[in-house]
A protein has these predicted regions:
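Carbohydrate-active catalytic/glycan-binding domains of CAZyme proteins
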Residues: 1-297
Length: 297
């Protein structure tokens, strides 16, 4: 199930067994996956192979054999799961993450695209919340903007975020994002439009123009919303709740390959805020984010 494999290291255990650790991409969708290049493990067997023939005496030719490492000798391919070398140590799948923003500093799970702009976020302005300040900057090549995320770890997952946001000026916008590159992302956001507030789904596919896939007024919006992105069977569902998570409404649906990795870099899910080119002092407060991955078997 692995593609783009390479950069292998061979390891011999104390009992004489051999394994190979290398980079590769899961073959989850269209020969690739949204997680990019990851670390894989396979068993190795050493098998003899004739590399040349030598004439040891006149007319007497003998094969010269070397031992070569054969990766995954039983099946000849990278399997989705390989038993760990040490059966007494069960494999731990770290496929869940929740941040209630109660700590004084962000955990190491969080990443930014490049060094964040000064004053991008605060964990102290509103205790128990992450305050993400709206910046005029938006997604652009080699740009810096109010965007932060955690790694997507499985092709099937649920990602949710609870946001408090009361925009005052036209086009002030905040919400969640799933992003692969500066030119390949999906934003699911609340945005100020006229006297009302809209819910908007924006899609930027690679080598295509930016598209507002859906936008509509939220009649009962009271400044609080829970976004949910549910990924199952190569499909993304974009849902939201206005009643604290008691009920969710399906807003839109897309195929997951709109942010499909075509290189070695994986996808992030995260939060995003922008004033779309206008200076502002507004912000969005995030109460929590939650991610749960579901391994494929």
């Amino acid at each position: 199930m692995g593609t783009c494999t390479g950069h292998a290291d061979l390891v011999e255990l104390k009992d004489g067994r051999w394994y190979m650790v290398f980079l590769g991409i899961r073959n989850d969708e269209e020969g690739t996956s949204n997680m990019g290049r990851e670390t894989h493990l396979v068993p190795v067997a050493w098998e003899p192979s004739t590399v040349r023939w030598e004439e040891v005496s006149k007319g007497n030719w003998q094969p010269v054999e070397y031992l070569w490492p054969v990766a995954s000798p039983e099946t000849g391919k990278v399997e989705r799961y390989t038993s760990l070398p040490f059966p007494e140590n069960p494999q731990y799948f770290n496929d869940a993450f929740t941040d209630n923003f109660d700590a004084e500093e962000l955990g190491h799970e969080w990443n930014f695209r490049r060094v964040p702009l000064p004053g991008t976020y605060s964990l102290s302005a509103f205790k128990g919340f992450l305050r993400l300040h709206l910046k005029p900057e938006t997604f652009k090549l080699l740009g810096r903007y109010s965007l932060m995320g955690i790694r997507q770890k499985e092709s099937d997952f649920d990602y949710s975020a609870k946001m408090h946001f009361e925009p005052n000026k036209e086009n002030e916008e905040a919400g969640i994002s799933i992003f692969q590159q500066d030119d390949n992302y999906v934003n699911f956001t609340v945005v100020k439009k006229g006297k009302g507030v809209n819910l908007k789904l924006t899609v930027k596919e690679r080598e295509k123009e930016l598209e507002v896939l859906k936008e509509e007024i939220i009649d009962k919006y009271q400044g609080e919303i829970i976004f949910k992105l549910s990924a199952k069977n190569n499909t993304y569902q974009y849902l939201y709740s206005l009643d604290g998570g008691n009920t969710f409404r399906l807003f839109a649906e897309t195929q997951s390959n709109i942010v499909l990795c075509k290189g070695y870099i994986g996808t992030y899910v995260g939060i995003y805020a922008t004033s779309n080119g206008k200076p502002t002092k507004e912000y969005a407060d995030f109460d929590w984010v939650s991610y749960k991955g579901y391994p494929r078997y």
